[in-house]
């Protein structure tokens, strides 16, 4: 049975003193052995974390006791292994970066559609269905007949709307994303641009996969997630994709057989994009990863120096203990 609980959460809420939440929140997470990243901004909180069921319950209870963070939106899934290496609480300008000033989902937002009502909406021929996620996410799974804006980051979405959508022509627009947060901003943006009927999937793809039976589902493929699972299937279990540690793109087992694939260094998606300097750095990082594995140590990217320092301190402690024992014998 999977014993690691993965919790994706967010809430748009005015947090004028969000900076003061960072230290107590980080302390709470570290004490509960919760790993992952939470973002705090003036507009709210967002992130995905993982830990034991008791730890996640404690985190949700802690957040519920903070002014403004009551009844936070969250979705749970499960994994056999911890999908994160670090514990972080970051202060940001936005909890999901669109880069457009004045977009406030607390003031105006699209119409929420429950997962059980989603199929009927997107089956309406008058509805334009838009996937608000990035291209690499869309490539491994999306809803039937959804439009892929082919964006590399969410910052590009407003330009896509400007070039491709027209409130006079597109009367009904439905949008979706992984957990719902990007749609909060994308629907708010469309409403600000004059679109009248704007809908979004409440709880995102993850909630849809949780509540809609596979035989009734209009979802095709797997859903990309921003942790070490890479993707989840319709049962919210780890999918078939791995991830290139160089470019972070999802890759299949077939792509790993390509000559362009070198573990931790390159894959078919990035082989022609990385510089010689990057390649050297990736080779060294992979060497350090393998070295850490051989010593049963956790390598966490750029934190390799911390691993080395921890090993040095351990050796120093053993040396001091040995010296004290020898001194006691004299």
From Swiss-Prot:
GO biological process: tRNA modification
Active site: 177 (cysteine persulfide intermediate)
Record domain Rhodanese: where: 123-217
Broadest EC class assigned to this enzyme: oxidoreductase
GO MF term (any one): oxidoreductase activity, acting on paired donors, with incorporation or reduction of molecular oxygen
Enzyme Commission code(s) on record: 1.14.-.-
Keyword flag Magnesium: no
Catalytic activity: uridine(34) in tRNA + AH2 + O2 = 5-hydroxyuridine(34) in tRNA + A + H2O
HAMAP family: TrhO
Family: Belongs to the TrhO family.
Role description: Catalyzes oxygen-dependent 5-hydroxyuridine (ho5U) modification at position 34 in tRNAs.
Name of the featured protein: tRNA uridine(34) hydroxylase
Organism: Shewanella sp. (strain ANA-3)
Protein's gene: trhO
């Amino acid at each position: 049975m999977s014993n690691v609980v993965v919790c994706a959460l967010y809430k748009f809420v005015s947090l004028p003193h969000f900076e003061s939440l960072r230290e107590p929140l980080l302390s709470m997470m570290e004490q509960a052995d919760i790993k992952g990243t939470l973002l705090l901004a003036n507009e709210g909180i967002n992130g995905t974390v993982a830990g034991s069921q008791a730890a996640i319950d404690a985190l949700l209870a802690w957040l519920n006791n903070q002014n403004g963070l009551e009844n936070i939106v969250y979705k749970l899934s499960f994994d056999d292994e911890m999908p994160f290496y670090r514990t972080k609480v970051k202060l940001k300008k936005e909890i999901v970066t669109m880069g457009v000033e004045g977009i406030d989902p607390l003031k105006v937002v699209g119409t929420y559609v429950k997962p059980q009502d989603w199929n009927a909406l997107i089956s309406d021929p008058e509805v334009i269905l838009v996937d608000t996620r990035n291209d690499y996410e869309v490539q491994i799974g999306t809803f039937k007949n959804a439009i892929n804006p082919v964006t590399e980051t969410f910052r590009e979405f407003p330009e896509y709307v400007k070039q491709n959508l027209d409130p006079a022509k597109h009367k009904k627009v439905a949008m979706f994303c992984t957990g719902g947060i990007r749609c909060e901003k994308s629907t708010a943006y469309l409403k600000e641009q004059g679109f009248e009927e704007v809908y979004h999937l409440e709880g995102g793809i993850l909630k849809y996969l949780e509540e809609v039976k596979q035989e009734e589902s209009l979802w095709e493929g797997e859903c990309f997630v921003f942790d070490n699972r890479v993707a989840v299937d319709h049962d919210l279990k780890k999918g078939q994709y791995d991830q290139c540690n160089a470019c972070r793109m999802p890759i299949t087992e077939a792509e790993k057989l390509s000559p362009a694939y070198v573990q931790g260094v390159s894959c078919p998606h990035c082989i022609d994009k990385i510089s010689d300097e990057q390649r050297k750095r990736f080779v060294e990082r992979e060497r350090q990863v393998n070295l850490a594995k051989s010593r049963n140590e956790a390598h966490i990217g750029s934190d390799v120096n911390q691993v080395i320092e921890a090993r040095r301190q351990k050796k120093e402690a053993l040396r001091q203990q040995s010296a004290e024992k020898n001194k006691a014998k004299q």
